[in-house]
Amino acid sequence: MADHGEQDALAAGLSGALTSFGHRLMARVYYADTDFSGVVYHARYLEFFERGRSDFLRLAGVHHTELADGKHGEKIVWVVRRMEIDFRASAKIDDILTIETRTKDISGARITMAQQLKRGDEMLVEAKVEAAIIGENGRPRRFPKDWIEAFMPEVV
């Protein structure tokens, strides 16, 4: 029976893993991810990237539910301000994908992340995402200092 990359995905764990560059998450392409032509529907890549960013935050100690519950003195949420996507090749049903997330820059209330979605060594999609945190009033909030340390990989 073919492996399809399952062993790597199982070894990585449900939330992926923090790496020297940031975060890596494995995901399988299901029938529901594809369009009538049999390839992954373009909007689904946004969902794969969202999972990568969310699990990176989770493993770095930042949990969406705690933010929404006011752990930092007020309810805050993440928002995507800008996204650039470069589609190079299509993923297909049963593909095992690797979603890599890196913090490119973080300052004040803004973070820029670079994401890559690969099938094996083949680059399928790249994204540059600018996000921020906002309070209940919709205004930007500064990142806590410990977040900045958690999101920036160690320089080797």
Segments (PLM) and residue ranges:
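Hot-dog-fold acyl-thioester-processing enzymes
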Residues: 2-80, 136-156
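A short, structured loop/turn motif at beta-sheet edges
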Residues: 17, 118-123
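C-terminal end-helix/capping segment
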Residues: 121-145
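Generic short beta-strand
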Residues: 31, 114-116, 131
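Hydrophobic beta-strand-centered segment that forms part of the acyl-chain substrate-binding groove
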Residues: 56-98, 102-105, 110-111, 125-126, ...
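Conserved GNAT-family N-acetyltransferase fold
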Residues: 49, 115, 127
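Residues that cap or initiate secondary-structure elements
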Residues: 33-35, 91, 107, 121, ...
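Core beta-strand residues in small-molecule sensory/regulatory alpha/beta domains
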Residues: 88, 116-118, 134
